[in-house]
Amino acid sequence: NDLPHIGHAYTSIICDTIKRFYILKGYDAKFLTGTDEHGLKVEKAANNKGVLPNKFVDDISKNFINLSRSLNILNDDFIRTTEPRHKKTVESFWNKLVKNNQIYLDKYEGWYSIKDESFFQEKELLKTNDKYQTIDGGDVEWIKEESYFFKLSNWEKKLLDYYEKNPDFIKPISRRNEVISFVKSGLKDLSVSRTSFTWGIKVPDSDKHIIYVWIDALTNYLTAINFPEIDDNNQVFWKNAHHIIGKDILKFHAIYWPALLMAIDFPLPKTIFAHGWWTNEGKKISKSAGNSIEPNYLISKFGLDQLKYFLIREITLGQDGDFSEKSFINRINSDLSNSLGNLISRTIKFTNKHFENKFPIELDGNILNSKILVSGYNLIEKYEVNIINFELNKALEKVWFFINQVNQYIDKMEPWSTIKINKVKTAETLSILIESIRLIGIILQPFIPEAAKKILDILNIDNNSRSFKFYNMKYAMKKNHPLNDAQPLFPRYNA
């Protein structure tokens, strides 16, 4: 119900990186994002602005669509929960729950947070001066109203069994342990409708009940695969689906969602991965604190690839991270401008000056099996394992270890000195360097796609020869392959 911030950008960048990785590996991959537009929180925010909810969410969704464009993410679908196709999915989902005897009508009495759009048991709240609040200090109110309930308590044992048999279902392990502990403490049936507001999808055959916003929101995943008429292709996608979420909505995705899917006899997604939060110089980002970090500001000032690189490289996926402009500038200057940018600039400029904009020599078996190139060719195996296991920063660490090896190689070989006395040896050195840069350009495409494209353009690599299939010595560059002029890739900034 507000402008997108760095946390929204972070989730999108993670998903986009993973999708680009699988595309480069030759897989068919789909990336879904969207906006959750119903509920009391949205209704109140619209009222406060003096506009109708539908006008309010139209404006909000445009901000998120524009963010996706600014981030240049490869999403295949953007689902708004106010769309007719989504309403159809939600109603079908609800009717299946009813048909399977998973829903009943009763009275709800308990604590509710408008901000979190969530019901809370007393054990989940903090009590200060006779006032209950959520752990992060949010207000809760005691409500009493008629409500439909989902028989969540019936699924406690089956959830625990599933977690045990599928240890990779919830990641990272700290979040898995958190969920298991919560479920073991006991689950109560879940209130899944409200009568105190009107902005939402109505319960079928009911005039006054609105479907709980989190059932509405979660089923957007099913809207993406055209539930309930799911074709074979979408069934394969669902079987391998990864839900990438912020840790604040883990309970809904790792407890309510699998229980709801089990209740309609529908398979569960492959993985629920909960990433951490970003703070701003040690302080939690919030609207009231006025310390929101605007992605578009960072993109316009420093560049899109710089933002993507920092967010992925700076922290382990799943942990919290702290943002400061100083640490941002230090990271991109050190890694992108110094290590990577300077390597490419000095290698290509020197080669083009002394070898007429052409790849100097044919790489024979001895050169291809040189220590530096073997290190480069072998890099991709562990890199792929890291990404498949959501260890994105570790994958980048491995790439930068290789980049540093290549920088050490150029300093050791000193082509600027050997060109005066041994042009053949210099040609070999430069050819090893340029082939290493080709590998770097290919392997960085999921993380910094615009810069990686420029690197491969400088090397004049055909657009059809940039997938991971070509990260192999049999596709090494050939003698006299034309090279383009080097261009600035990463400007330096003052901290």
Would you name each region that the model predicts?
Residues 1-33, 85-89, 135-353, 395-399:
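Structured secondary-structure scaffolds
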Residues 38, 291, 375-379, 436:
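N-terminal alpha-helical segment
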Residues 1-162, 166-168:
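N-terminal, positively charged nucleic-acid-binding surface of large information/translation enzymes
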Residues 250, 311-314, 318, 327, ...:
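Active-site-proximal binding-pocket segments
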Residues 30, 34, 50, 85, ...:
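Basic, alpha-helical terminal appendages of large translation-related enzymes
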Residues 111-116, 276-278, 327, 362-367, ...:
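A glycine-rich phosphate-binding loop feature that marks nucleotide/adenosyl-phosphate handling sites
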Residues 65-68, 94, 98, 341, ...:
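Structural signal for well-ordered, non-membrane alpha-helices
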Residues 17, 55-66, 92, 339-346, ...:
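A non-catalytic, amphipathic alpha-helix used as a structural packing/dimerization or gating element
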